[in-house]
């Protein structure tokens, strides 16, 4: 169905608004993936705080102008599915990586984070970013480990000192 000018402007405005509030974006080619699989992907995306949309490349190019995702323009070739992560920068990358593992025809093209283009081969960099809770848990674990190690070293030094005095 052909879009009139107002429809195209509405799509560009919607995508531009989502892009302004997004932390990262991932672009993929979903040719050959069945509708029920795409529906599952969209459902998982909604649960993860990821906005997904298939948009014409010309409209998408206009929508990302002036955003940190302008670096993705060269990847807008063929059918383009774009996903914007608004809650966690690695959410869309993690979702697409897992989906591509189960669906051979689904191809991740590239991602963008803080204005930097991340090629598909390096998408793991973005997908493995810890969530806020995971980062806090790792930090707390490191801090507890350091405190326990210091206690052990202090007790060992105290033991050595008492042994030296007794000898």
From Swiss-Prot:
Key words of the record: Ribonucleoprotein, Ribosomal protein, RNA-binding, rRNA-binding
A Pfam family matched in the record: Ribosomal_L10
GO terms (BP aspect): translation
One cellular component (GO) term of this entry: large ribosomal subunit
Function: Forms part of the ribosomal stalk, playing a central role in the interaction of the ribosome with GTP-bound translation factors.
Family statement: Belongs to the universal ribosomal protein uL10 family.
SUBUNIT field: Part of the ribosomal stalk of the 50S ribosomal subunit. The N-terminus interacts with L11 and the large rRNA to form the base of the stalk. The C-terminus forms an elongated spine to which L12 dimers bind in a sequential fashion forming a multimeric L10(L12)X complex.
Annotated protein name in UniProt: Large ribosomal subunit protein uL10
Organism, as annotated: Yersinia enterocolitica serotype O:8 / biotype 1B (strain NCTC 13174 / 8081)
Name of the gene encoding the protein in the UniProt record: rplJ
């Amino acid at each position: 169905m052909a879009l009139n000018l107002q429809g195209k402007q509405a799509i560009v405005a919607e995508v531009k608004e989502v892009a302004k509030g997004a932390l990262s974006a991932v672009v993929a080619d979903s040719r050959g993936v069945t509708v029920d699989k795409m529906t599952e992907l969209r459902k998982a995306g909604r649960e993860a705080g990821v906005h997904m949309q298939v948009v014409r490349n010309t409209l998408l190019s206009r929508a990302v102008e002036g955003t940190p995702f302008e670096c993705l323009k060269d990847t807008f070739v063929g059918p383009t599915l774009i996903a914007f992560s608004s809650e966690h920068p690695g959410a869309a990358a993690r979702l697409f990586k897992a989906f591509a593992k189960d669906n051979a025809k689904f191809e991740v093209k590239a991602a963008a984070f803080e204005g930097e283009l991340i090629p598909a081969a390096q998408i793991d960099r973005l997908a493995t970013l810890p969530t806020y809770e995971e980062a806090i848990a790792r930090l707390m674990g490191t801090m507890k480990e350091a405190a326990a190690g210091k206690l052990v070293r202090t007790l060992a030094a105290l033991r050595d000192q008492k042994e030296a005095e007794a000898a």
